[in-house]
């Protein structure tokens, strides 16, 4: 694995390096975050969207006729039961500025970090550490065919719209319960202009303490 970057405030950087504090948040937190649209906030976090440019084609069962609907297809994972920790593959002044970061911490040995992460997660009985996934985010356009991705919650958790591609995100994701079970998603057709569902008031989070990480990190002042 290549080095990974996390953008922090000074206080949070100190907590990460000295105590190994890693805060996993539920996908629903980022879905409902309202303070910085297009940075941390993503109202479609945890949802795979398919919206073809020429309309969503469906076949009428009675007549066999194919028609194009203006609706979009949404497949949503269990957003309160999938916890993620987000980093970046790029040390960038632009990324730092957009996140309003004071410090960038470069994780020099991600494999050692991952081992510590697995060990800490294994102590949380509600989580499935054996199903922990970690990869660069796959960025996509809504017109792209969803293939089988719509039925796979762990793939949905690792995808974001291309408008976020500047973040070069690398994500760690772990499920609670059966959140990664195949087809454990809510699928619906959404008509144009339909109001967004009410936002959640509570968003689960998970604070891990991995111990001092200074030997596998480099701190960059911004």
Please report, for each region that a protein language model flagged, where it lies by residue.
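NAD-dependent ADP-ribosyltransferases
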Residues: 1-222
